[in-house]
């Protein structure tokens, strides 16, 4: 006659069929915010089991309670093995875990934008095809501007997010299914199904004749009495973000103990108060725990029960089960075809008072970025989520916000989600002064992470690559240093500004090039010293204006050539003095005119000459020679061209350096 689990305390249902695998015993543990795991000892008289038919499948353990109703433990098979056989049975071992465990088999690098913790958890679960979960959240959670899953399993990622936010989870079991309950308050702790109360029975000695607790111990630990956090927000750099939360537990003078930590992972003092309270509750949750053993088959983590009949009346209160170790076995090990009288079940459990809010310990480490990474700056058209973004730029070549932040894409971001706006380290940063160069779209930048936190990137440098090459071929121009820009938008290789230094011995040079205008404004003196020649070429007009005097000294010659007119206006006196000769020659007219007096004075000789006629005055006398000399005999004086010098143009004003600068 085939063996059956029908009359047994424990049984297993699998996709292989009824009683193909007989449950001889199991042990395991479950805990709030922990993956449950049950190790099963199995027997089969049906022949070899194909492992692929059972691994990854859903199975259900049933434990018959004292009222003959079943209590279920449902899960997925993560491990299956065969250990041996005898004349009747082949022995197998099985490990049963929640569907959440499957997320330990996925690891990824992924970026989330403007999502709450519940949004992210839901997205991770749904993307992996898991739907058996529900939220019971009372708290309000702000969207996170930027959240990174970095080289970690999906399970670790959602675990640390929930731990960070004080969110816990446990499982509801039913036949063929288990549901993950995600909660953040004591209201989520319902009474154990079929076990609202549990009596304490010291005399039972572990005899499982009723649902009783047969051992109970309670312990209290001295914990810190205050939690203080602080952080820094570059958008409000002067704000004091320190937040503190005192403990509601007062024991052993714990008020003098304080935990101070940085960073608190918040951006405002109000949010800091919420985080400090969560951290304090996390500290308080473990201050008092009770440990016990029982035969209460309905005990399930995440649920509550009322302790009764304890000899110390203060112990009789409501408790939340936080951890349970289960052990059950078939007494005769199926040595008999029928039975069950020797079957046993017991557990060891840990619980906390219902009055103390449960907060999960932050046990899941956040990934630590070991060093800087490189990334590519992207433009607005490449950005997957621009909601609420205040970035602006002239074109797709530059995309920056008012803080000088740009958006980058990391090489590990296979989804192409891109980063948040990332601050850029500059050489100097003051109040409205300093240095700034904005990384442009397509450039490769060096990204560091504050305290190694993948959620806190900062650009600390820029690097060339095979697509974005150096301005001058190397090593040919290895002695050349330059600061060379590119005109935007649509600028080409010939559109740039540049400040260049050549340090090759004998060829040293400072080169300055502007694509359009060059403005210089000095509030005091300018002094120049040139050791050799100076050349100046102006292809159009040159205007100069001096508010005071203009002094010029030339040791050698002054040679000037004017292609058209030369106009000079003097408001008062015009003085010219030549050490030797002074010669003026005009192709047509020289006109001298004075409002009062014209004096021509010569030391030895003065000559007026027109053609063959002249008047010559010298120390020997005055000679007048002409074809005809007429004195008071009619005729008329010649006329000159007059003097109408053109007024000089005022030079353009240099850019005054005001905010915004010269943009045309």
Protein language model regions, located:
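Short, well-ordered loop/turn sites that connect or cap secondary structure elements
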Residues: 53-54, 299, 315, 439
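Assembly/oligomerization scaffold segments
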Residues: 1-110, 164, 287
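Acidic, low-complexity/disordered segments
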Residues: 313-374, 460-466, 470, 475, ...
